[in-house]
A protein has these predicted regions:
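Surface polyanion/phosphate-binding segment centered on an Asp-His-Pro turn
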Residues: 23-37, 73-74, 96-97, 156-253
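Eukaryotic short linear interaction motifs
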Residues: 7-9, 29-32, 46-49, 81-84, ...
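Beta-strand elements of modular eukaryotic interaction domains
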Residues: 9-13, 23-29, 62-65, 127, ...
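Active-site metal-binding loops of divalent metal-dependent hydrolases
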Residues: 42-44, 77-78
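Short coil/turn segments at secondary-structure boundaries
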Residues: 12-15, 51-55, 85-89, 177-179, ...
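Structured beta-strand-rich core segments of catalytic domains in phosphoester-bond hydrolases
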Residues: 1-42, 180
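Active-site beta-loop-alpha junctions of metal-dependent nucleic acid enzymes
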Residues: 15-20, 44-58
Length: 253
């Protein structure tokens, strides 16, 4: 799942059957802060399910734990329909009202668009979490997804339930976001992909590589040359020495 090239820069954190927390280290990717990333790796049970755990609530508790240590990214199938409701406090300001001295108003950000016009209770819960912890939905808001494409295609209708959600401070580092074409034979969900600006510190490979011999081009007279080569004393001696090496056990004494 993680390319070997960047694996040294990734730390695995909390894991459940529904999601996996990862930590891409700031020292490896040259981020301003560590980026705590939650990947929803399985389908979150729908509303009304008898499954006893509120997965979004569990993720929110983790966000509370990690948010003061770095930035947050959530991604994957949230099974939450959010229409295109606000995920930030509109016209937020600390002017003219009594607020804490260290209060910082929400960043000004463009509204997002969404082909899905339905809002469900879990969608409201997800939006509340975004507002509470200054996280913003990437879908329908960046280069690559100007229309807010559906991400799930079912027999009873299409929906947008797969997301990338970023700490608002990270938004300027997003290069593009894409909802890829769906392949019904593989999944009823579209793959979502995102490009994030980073500068990876790669360790130079100092292993001495053996030079590979040049390719031999076979010609009409090559067969005869091949036979003559095996008749030469030089080649006979090399083959003899090789056979001796193979038959002699390598034992330390």
């Amino acid at each position: 799942m993680i390319k070997p090239l960047i694996r040294p820069g990734i730390t695995f954190l909390k894991s459940t059957s529904e999601y996996q927390w990862l930590l891409p280290k700031k020292s490896f990717f040259n981020f301003e802060k560590d980026v705590y990333t939650c990947m929803c790796i399985s389908h979150i049970p729908p509303e009304g399910s008898t499954y006893g755990i509120n997965v979004l609530e569990s993720i929110e508790n983790d966000v509370i734990l990690y948010r003061d240590k770095g930035h947050i990214i959530l991604c994957g199938d949230m099974n939450a329909r959010t229409r295109c409701e606000k995920d930030y406090i509109e016209n937020d300001s600390n002017d003219g009202i009594n607020v804490y001295d260290n209060y910082s108003p929400d960043f000004s950000i463009s509204d997002w668009v969404n082909e899905d016009k339905t809002l469900c209770d879990r969608g409201k819960q997800l939006l509340d979490m975004c507002i509470s912890y200054r996280m913003r939905i990437v879908n329908g808001r960046t280069v690559g997804d100007s229309t807010g494409k559906f991400t799930c295609y079912m027999y009873n209708g299409n929906s947008t339930i797969d997301y990338f959600i970023f700490s608002e401070c990270l938004f300027n580092d997003i290069l593009s976001f894409h909802v890829n074409d769906v392949f019904p034979k593989l999944s009823d969900h579209s793959k979502i992909s995102l490009r994030l600006a980073a500068s990876v510190n790669l360790v130079e490979n100092k292993v001495q590589m053996t030079e590979f011999p040049c390719n031999f081009i076979w010609k009409k007279d090559s067969e005869e040359s091949y036979k003559k080569a095996f008749q030469s004393d030089l080649i006979k001696d090399k083959i003899k020495n090789l056979c001796i090496d193979i038959e002699t056990p390598d034992i330390d004494t």
